[in-house]
Amino acid sequence: MFTEEMVHTALQTWCDNVVKVGKVHAEGGDAKAFSLQVLSESYDYDNGHVLFKPTLTFGQQTFRPTKEGALSYFVGGNSDYPDDNGFKLKPWVKVWYSKEDFILHGDLAIVQCNVHFIGEDDSHIFVNKSFVFKLCDDGKVKIILHQSSLPYQP
């Protein structure tokens, strides 16, 4: 059964991993390998189906139903996804969530929130997120839906 504490842990882990990927990259580490590890630990690509709509995608590559597509969005460098620049490589030095709301439904948590990103250059953006987290049979929490968009600007 999913709990409120598990929602906050899952969201904080997601935010922390964004910072960690950028740090690995900035320190000359293998950001691609680290991102693959994060994808395996945090998303259900290896065992199931994931619905992922990154913030800055469009056209034929708007949705990323494969681990390869998600990895490309996070770290770039894949010629099959020429518009991906590696969103997580900026690096982001601080990432946090706010204004979360959620529905707990058995082994699922359906979550909406804002996520704020502070760049090394002190830039600040925030995006609207929707996640569905699943409590898997092995006790691990995995993302099965991740939707991200920029706030509407009239």
Describe the residue ranges of each PLM region.
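Conserved aromatic-histidine-acidic binding/catalytic patches
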Residues: 2-6, 103, 121
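Short beta-strand edge/turn micro-motifs at domain boundaries
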Residues: 104-112, 116, 120-154
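Mature soluble binding/inhibitory domains
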Residues: 4, 8, 21-25, 49, ...
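A solvent-exposed, acidic/Ser-Thr-rich amphipathic alpha-helical stretch
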Residues: 25-99
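N-terminal membrane-sensor/transducer module of prokaryotic signaling receptors
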Residues: 10, 16-36, 147
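Basic/polar N-terminal segments that are highly enriched at the extreme N-terminus
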Residues: 1-16, 151-154
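N-terminal, helix-rich and Lys/Arg-enriched segments in bacterial and organellar proteins
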Residues: 18, 22, 37-43, 111-115, ...
